[in-house]
Design a protein with these regions (language model features):
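Catalytic-domain carbohydrate-binding cleft regions of carbohydrate-active enzymes
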Residues: 1-282
Length: 282
C-alpha cells in the first residue's frame, strides 16, 4: 500500500501506473506543455522502467557498508563490496516490489515488465491524437512490446562501438519490421565503448537508409561527432547522400506503412527459391 520510490536521472521518483487507463490519460496530458512550446518530436527513454536504485535497496546497502567500514577487507570482500554497489541498478527484487492495476486486478510489475514501455508510449500517442490531431508527431521509445508500432517507433537501445554490433544492427532491422516496427534505427557508431573512424563511417553509411539516423554515445566515451575525425569530407558526403535520398526513403517508408509491408527484407524473402539466400545474415 506504500508508494514505491526509485531513482533515475532526476533522483528519487515515482513511476506512473501506465497500465491503468486513467493514469495513462494523466501522464499523456503532461505532453501538452511541451507541445505548446512548439516541440513536435519526442524520445521516450528509460521506460523499462530503468531504476538506478530503490530507496529500500539503498538503505540495505548503506547498512552493510557501515558494517564493514572499519574492516581490513581482503580481495574477496572487495569484490563482494563492488557487487553490492553495482547490484543497486535494475535489481530484479525491485521489479517485484511494486504493482499495477490491470482491468481492476492487482498485478506485480515483474509479471508485466515488458508492457511498461508500451503503456508509456501508448499514453503519449493517445494524448497526441487528442492534443494535436492535425499533426504527425514524431515519437520513438527505448522500451516496447508488440503492438506499440501503432503509437510510435523504437530505437535499438544501448549498443556498443563494436563491429559485431554493426552486424547485429543489420539483423535487427528486418526482425523489428516483422514485428510491425518500421520507424527504427540504432545509435550510429555505438553507444558504449570508443568508436574508431572506420567503424563510424561504415555505420553512418548504413544509417543513410534507416528511418532514424542518429549518432549517439554515452558519457565517458570518445567524442564521436563527425567533425572530430579526420575524414570530415567523407562524413559530409554521407550526410549529403541521406538528404538527397529523403524523397525516395520517405516514399518507400509510406508504401511499407500503407501496404503492411517490410522496409528491410532478408534476402530469403526476395529470393525464395535460393537456398543460399536463407543463410545470408549480413
Amino acid at each position: 500500500g506504500k508508494e514505491f520510490v526509485g531513482a533515475v536521472w532526476p533522483g528519487k521518483v515515482h513511476f506512473p501506473d501506465v497500465l491503468d487507463r486513467e493514469a495513462r490519460k494523466w501522464f499523456g496530458s503532461k505532453y501538452k506543455f511541451l507541445l505548446d512550446q512548439g516541440i513536435e518530436g519526442f524520445w521516450n527513454d528509460m521506460n523499462e522502467p530503468a531504476i538506478f536504485y530503490s530507496e529500500k535497496n539503498l538503505n540495505k546497502v548503506m547498512k552493510e557498508i557501515k558494517a564493514i567500514k572499519n574492516d581490513n577487507m581482503d580481495m574477496w570482500e572487495v569484490f563482494a563490496f563492488k557487487d553490492l554497489v553495482s547490484g543497486l541498478a535494475n535489481n530484479p527484487e525491485d521489479y517485484k516490489s511494486f504493482y499495477h492495476t490491470v482491468d481492476g486486478e492487482t498485478v506485480r510489475h515483474d509479471k508485466v515488465h515488458n508492457l511498461y514501455g508500451y503503456g508509456m508510449t501508448r499514453a503519449a500517442g493517445e494524448a497526441f491524437e487528442e492534443l494535436a490531431p492535425e499533426k504527425r508527431i514524431l515519437m520513438f521509445s527505448r522500451s516496447s512490446y508488440i503492438g506499440m508500432h501503432r503509437y510510435g517507433g523504437i530505437w535499438m537501445g544501448d549498443n556498443k562501438s563494436w563491429w559485431s554490433h554493426l552486424l547485429l544492427n543489420l539483423k535487427m532491422l528486418p526482425s523489428l519490421n516483422m514485428c510491425g516496427f518500421l520507424y527504427t534505427g540504432a545509435d550510429l557508431g555505438g553507444f558504449g565503448a570508443d568508436v574508431t573512424e572506420d567503424l563510424l563511417l561504415r555505420w553512418m553509411a548504413l544509417g543513410i537508409f534507416t528511418p532514424l539516423m542518429r549518432n549517439h554515445s554515452a558519457l565517458g566515451t570518445r567524442d564521436q561527432e563527425c567533425y572530430r575525425f579526420t575524414k570530415t569530407e567523407t562524413f559530409r558526403s554521407l550526410i549529403g547522400i541521406r538528404y538527397g535520398l529523403m524523397p525516395y526513403l520517405y516514399s518507400e517508408f509510406m508504401k511499407a506503412a500503407l501496404e503492411d509491408k517490410m522496409l528491410f527484407l532478408p534476402l530469403a524473402f526476395v529470393y525464395t527459391e535460393d537456398s543460399h539466400a536463407r543463410e545470408v545474415e549480413d
